[in-house]
């Protein structure tokens, strides 16, 4: 991930020029890019490879959450613990997705307290926003 210096005392970003960044939280893949000399440059991962990250989460044993390609590899083996296309559920009520629950390998539930859907994984419940934040954190 790119490093940006921040002057905590002043609250300013220390940079030689303006930094323009874009984040694509995609239904299938996500990535971060920035502008350099008028052209977009995708942020690369630690290995220097493309940082195109599959928007997939896998909840492994314990508290381990795997994000990206390794999570996508678990879709067939463990569909109930592997979350994909969560962006499609953001801001949706259970009424909005009623009749489509079987299209997901994971459990989409009705949450009367907020009238928004939640996703059940093992013994925990997550909102689509919480799950999307986990994907963004990996970028």
Residue ranges and their predicted role:
Residues 1-54, 59-139:
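N-terminal phosphate-binding loop and flanking beta/alpha elements of the actin-like ATPase fold
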């Amino acid at each position: 991930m790119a490093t940006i210096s921040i002057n905590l005392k002043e609250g300013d970003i220390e940079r030689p020029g303006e930094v323009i960044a874009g984040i694509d939280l995609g239904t299938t893949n996500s990535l971060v890019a920035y502008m350099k000399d008028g052209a977009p440059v995708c942020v690369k991962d630690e290995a220097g490879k493309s940082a195109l990250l599959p928007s997939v989460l896998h909840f492994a044993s314990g508290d381990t959450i795997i994000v990206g390609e390794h999570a996508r590899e678990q879709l067939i083996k463990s569909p109930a613990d592997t979350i994909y296309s969560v962006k499609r559920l953001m801001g949706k009520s259970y009424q909005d997705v009623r009749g489509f629950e079987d299209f997901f390998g994971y459990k989409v539930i009705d949450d009367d307290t907020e009238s928004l859907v939640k996703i059940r994984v093992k013994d925990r419940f997550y909102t689509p926003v919480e799950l999307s934040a986990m994907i963004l954190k990996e970028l």
